[in-house]
Amino acid sequence: MKTWPSRAVSLLLLALALPVGCSEPPPPVRDPDTLATIRERGELVVLTLAGPTSLIENEDGPPSGYEVDLANAFAASLGVTARFEVAASLPDLFDALAAGDGHVAAAGLTLTPERSERLAFSPVYKSVTEQLVCRRGGVNPTRLERLPDADIVVLEGSSYEETLRAIGVTHTALRWRTRPGGSAMPLLEAVDDGQADCTIADSHLADFARRRHPELIVARNLTGEQPLAWAYDARIDGLGEALSAWFATAHADGLLEALDETWFGRFGDYDYVDVARFVRRVENRLPRYRRLFEAAADELPFEWELLAAQAYQESHWDPDAVSATGVRGLMMLTLSTAERVGIDDRTDPEQSIVGGAAYLDDLYERVPDSVTGPDRLWFALAAYNVGMGHMYDARRLAERLGRDKDSWDDLAEILPLLSDPAHYSTLRYGYARGHEPVRYVAKIREYRALLAAQDL
């Protein structure tokens, strides 16, 4: 089990566990902590699993991820830091919780009737759908009666086994295989490689996986919405009450919604052609320029994945790209912008990346101070696309219409109005194709997320 000490950041919740097999001796059980001892030690021990929707392991820093942010936020509410213990599999996670090796289990755990009989859970913080994921052109059981025709492999100890057992009551020929592990992602990759016909994954993971492996398809939903919650050690006096109070506050304050948007709201409608092209170009174009993106990011407060994602949206990583309006290169710079940032050859990959990154940094610094957090970056990216003047106009219009001029979500709804004569005629910078920066930012966020998780 891998361990990370971590500091506090955003929000959370999660849940799960299973009984120990009757043929194995039960694990030794530690004496339970109390909330007071947790605070005295300054540490909340969080059991979790590695995967795109829970915890992402970073070679050069602490882990990141949806569940990491949630757990960090809850730990901060207690005045402590979170230490993450990463289990190798779901059964290991459940055993560790039963043995008292952790205070909470936060790993995208589905709150099922079987688990509820054995474990204590936090309030529900997210809902997902269990989906049957298969390979394009392969076995595609869109009807339940066709499920026995498929070679199905699922995660050992998962809620997916419970789902299949329930289906098997009426479809008695149904069979499936299981594999141990902490995430369904390797099973999705196995389906993509032809090692199995289908697997089951939560909808937010399936959505992510299809953007890395475009030949995967969702054959059908197997459940309605399923609740996710944290499991916790019920022997710790006051922990359940603390979780209930914190989740209620996190929901009321919009923290759960914000975190969900940060990690899972970045994907728009699925476009098979676009995703397949992106995957090909990650393989055959990105390696030529990755070092240049990394070097540019080292000098600025941006991740290399962000710069690479922006360049892909601009030019599909084509250094000779040129538009009808005369912008050129990987970062599609205008002649005046190139002169402003001090480059003389817009088609030179290194110069283009350095110049584009410098220009984005300049825009970022010019965003009003009242715009904070991720919204500041989305604002700067939109300005790169449509111009800072039009972004200022959008802020003015947002204010007139009673919207929050500092919120990217609100501006994303206001910007398309810049093509409406009733509005742009009253603004300083006039007409703009305001839907374009909205799509521009959305696509960069999607590509950035895929690049950041490419090594998972």
Curated annotation (Swiss-Prot):
Keywords: Cell outer membrane, Cell wall biogenesis/degradation, Lyase, Membrane, Signal. It is a peripheral membrane protein. Residues 23-267 are annotated as: Non-LT domain. GO terms for cellular component: cell outer membrane. Residues 1-22 form the signal peptide. Residues 268-456 are annotated as: LT domain. It is found in: Cell outer membrane. One of its GO terms (molecular function) is peptidoglycan lytic transglycosylase activity. It catalyses: Exolytic cleavage of the (1->4)-beta-glycosidic linkage between N-acetylmuramic acid (MurNAc) and N-acetylglucosamine (GlcNAc) residues in peptidoglycan, from either the reducing or the non-reducing ends of the peptidoglycan chains, with concomitant formation of a 1,6-anhydrobond in the MurNAc residue. The active site is at residue 314. The keyword S-adenosyl-L-methionine does not apply. Its main location: membrane. GO terms for biological process: cell wall macromolecule catabolic process; cell wall organization; peptidoglycan catabolic process. Its EC number is 4.2.2.n1. Murein-degrading enzyme that degrades murein glycan strands and insoluble, high-molecular weight murein sacculi, with the concomitant formation of a 1,6-anhydromuramoyl product. Lytic transglycosylases (LTs) play an integral role in the metabolism of the peptidoglycan (PG) sacculus. Their lytic action creates space within the PG sacculus to allow for its expansion as well as for the insertion of various structures such as secretion systems and flagella. In the N-terminal section; belongs to the bacterial solute-binding protein 3 family. In the C-terminal section; belongs to the transglycosylase Slt family. PANTHER family: MEMBRANE-BOUND LYTIC MUREIN TRANSGLYCOSYLASE F. The N-terminal domain does not have lytic activity and probably modulates enzymatic activity. The C-terminal domain is the catalytic active domain. This is Membrane-bound lytic murein transglycosylase F. It comes from Maricaulis maris (strain MCS10). The lineage of its organism: Bacteria, Pseudomonadati, Pseudomonadota, Alphaproteobacteria, Maricaulales. The gene is mltF.
